[in-house]
C-alpha cells in the first residue's frame, strides 16, 4: 500500500465556525463539521456577550496520516472562548505525519480566547501544527499551546518521532509574531539545554492586539512563580509567556492566572473557568 493510499484512509476532520455579534450577543451563525471534529452547543456561563464553545475529537486521538483542519471567523465585535473537551493525544506513528491546521480571522472589535487543553505526544509520534491568525485593527487574540512530550507519568520519554509547531499572527499585512519550533525525538535533544533540558512539557501563551503596560507584564512575571522555567517577553501590541518544566498543572495554573489578569484589565470580566476543565 502506498503512502498516499494510507493518508486517504486516515481521518480528514474539518471544523468551520463563524461567530457574529447580534444585539450585543455573540452567536454561532455557521457551523460546518466533518468527523472526527465536532463542536458542542454554545453556552453562556457569563452572559450573552461571550459565547463559549467546546470542541470534541470523537476518535479519541490522532494517528499518522490524519489531517485536522479548523477555520474560525469572528465577525466585528464578536467575543468567543473556545476550548477542547479533553487533552489531545497523538499516537506513535508508523512513519506518516499527523497534521493539524488552524486558520483564524478576527474582525474589528472582536476577541477570541483560544484555550485548548494540552496535547500529549506519545513516543514515536510525528506531528505538525500550523496556526495562523489574521487580526483586523482593534481585534484581540489570546491563545495558548501546552505540549507534553511522552507519557512521562509512565516514565516514557520522547526519544523517537518529530514535533513541529508553526505559528503566525498578522495584523493588516504586518507580522506581529512568527514562531517556528522543531523538536526531533532523540536522547540528545531531550536532555540538551537547547532542547527540552530533560523537561517533558513546554508551553506558550500569547496576547496580541492591544498594547500592554509594563505593570501588566511585571504582574504576569510575578505570577510565574514555578519550579519549571518561566519567562515573559514584551511584543509589539502584546506579550508572550513561555514555560519549560515537568508539571501540566503548574503551567496551566500560571497561564490561567495570566489569562484572568488580562480579562480583568481589558474587559472587566471576572473569573470564569470552563466547566469541562473540571471534569
Curated annotation (Swiss-Prot):
Keywords tagged on the record: Chaperone, Cytoplasm, Nickel insertion
Compartment(s): Cytoplasm
Record GO cellular component, one term: cytoplasm
The keyword RNA-binding belongs to this UniProt entry's keyword annotation: no
Pfam families xref list: UreD
GO MF entries: nickel cation binding
Assigned protein family: Belongs to the UreD family.
HAMAP family: UreD (MF_01384)
Subunit: UreD, UreF and UreG form a complex that acts as a GTP-hydrolysis-dependent molecular chaperone, activating the urease apoprotein by helping to assemble the nickel containing metallocenter of UreC. The UreE protein probably delivers the nickel.
Protein's job: Required for maturation of urease via the functional incorporation of the urease nickel metallocenter.
Protein's UniProt name: Urease accessory protein UreD
Naturally occurring in which organism (per UniProt): Nostoc sp. (strain PCC 7120 / SAG 25.82 / UTEX 2576)
Lineage, opening ranks: Bacteria, Bacillati, Cyanobacteriota, Cyanophyceae, Nostocales
Amino acid at each position: 500500500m502506498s503512502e498516499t493510499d494510507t493518508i486517504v484512509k486516515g481521518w480528514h476532520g474539518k471544523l468551520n465556525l463563524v461567530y457574529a455579534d447580534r444585539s450585543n450577543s455573540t452567536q454561532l451563525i455557521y457551523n460546518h463539521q466533518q468527523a472526527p471534529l465536532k463542536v458542542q452547543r454554545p453556552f453562556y456561563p457569563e452572559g450573552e456577550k461571550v459565547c463559549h464553545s467546546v470542541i470534541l475529537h470523537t476518535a479519541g486521538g490522532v494517528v499518522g496520516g490524519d489531517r485536522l483542519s479548523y477555520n474560525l471567523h469572528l465577525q466585528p465585535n464578536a467575543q468567543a472562548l473556545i476550548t477542547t473537551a479533553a487533552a489531545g493525544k497523538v499516537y506513535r506513528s508508523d512513519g506518516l505525519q499527523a497534521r493539524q491546521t488552524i486558520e483564524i480571522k478576527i474582525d474589528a472589535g472582536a476577541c477570541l480566547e483560544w484555550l485548548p487543553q494540552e496535547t500529549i505526544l506519545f513516543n514515536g509520534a510525528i506531528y505538525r501544527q500550523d496556526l495562523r491568525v489574521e487580526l483586523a485593527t482593534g481585534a484581540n487574540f489570546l491563545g495558548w499551546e501546552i505540549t507534553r512530550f511522552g507519557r512521562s507519568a509512565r516514565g516514557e520519554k520522547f526519544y523517537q518521532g518529530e514535533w513541529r509547531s508553526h505559528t503566525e499572527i498578522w495584523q493588516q499585512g504586518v507580522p506581529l509574531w512568527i514562531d517556528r519550533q522543531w523538536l526531533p525525538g532523540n536522547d540528545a535533544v531531550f536532555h540538551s539545554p537547547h532542547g527540552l533540558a530533560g523537561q517533558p512539557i513546554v508551553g506558550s501563551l500569547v496576547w496580541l492586539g492591544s498594547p500592554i503596560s509594563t505593570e501588566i507584564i511585571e504582574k504576569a512575571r510575578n505570577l510565574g512563580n514555578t519550579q519549571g522555567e518561566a519567562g515573559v517577553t514584551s511584543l509589539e501590541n502584546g506579550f508572550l509567556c513561555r514555560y519549560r518544566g515537568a508539571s501540566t498543572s503548574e503551567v496551566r495554573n500560571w497561564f490561567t492566572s495570566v489569562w484572568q489578569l488580562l480579562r480583568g484589565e481589558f474587559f472587566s470580566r471576572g473569573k470564569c473557568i470552563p466547566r469541562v476543565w473540571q471534569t
